[in-house]
Amino acid sequence: MNDTATSPGIDAVRALERVASGSDLGEAEADALLEAMASAEIAPTLAGGMLIALRCKGECAAEIRGFANAMRRLARRPSVPAGGRYVDIVGTGGDGSGSLNLSTGAALLAAACGAAVVKHGNRSVSSRCGSADVLTALGLPLPLDEQRAGDCLAELGFTFLFAPHYHPAMKHIAPVRAALGVRTVFNILGPLANPAAPPYHVIGAFSERIAALMAETLSGMDIERAFVVHGAEGWDEATPIGPFVCFDVRRGSVTREVRDPADYGLSRC
């Protein structure tokens, strides 16, 4: 462990002072900060202080984008062909609904309909079971290593990237998050840090504010199109319960819409 407060890419103490005073970090600074935390170049107490300061200030899109880019760069890369038209269907969790894992069912259905799905996920956050729990129960041996993940996609049109396996650099950050015990930027980074960098996304968010923030973040990333949704009654899903907000994201643009299940011939429940 390096007990100094600087790394070759960032002066973490100065960055913390700026964030604590209400200033935003730039995308490159956030990228360097995440790499410094992941490599244990800054002390856990300083890393924890930074995460709390960011939450109190309110993370901006550039900061989240920098964190996501660093996570992808440090991740293990699945053996899937570059430039593929892949989609990830995922939710942030944390909506407190205690729901079934709807995003996994949607991902499997999309694959059955011909989409190439590269799903990135973990175990349960707020649902009765997380995507990894569901897929394990269905007989998929997890984690799939880089080659097996690619083979699974080629054979089935679906594969799953188990986050703890694909993000080994996060091992130094996990104890900090556990010690803090509160929501931080990492609770919304998962859907943005898929190591396969799919060009298409469907993401559910636990609040409209977070959905808008994730949409703004994605608009500056290398994507083709993404839908970020927040559902009726606070769900991180688009459901038949009622209308849902949908942020339609393309590179450089975000359009907010309110959609209703009735628009698609579905009765409310």
What does each of the following model-derived ranges do?
Residues 1-98, 113, 269:
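Acidic, glycine/proline-rich low-complexity segments that act as flexible tails and inter-domain linkers
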Residues 49, 65-68, 148-152, 229:
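Beta-strand segments within the central parallel beta-sheet cores of soluble alpha/beta enzyme folds
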Residues 80-90, 118-124, 186-189:
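Core alpha/beta catalytic barrel or barrel-like domain that forms the active/cofactor pocket
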Residues 91, 95-152:
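A generic, well-ordered mixed alpha/beta core segment in the N-terminal half of proteins
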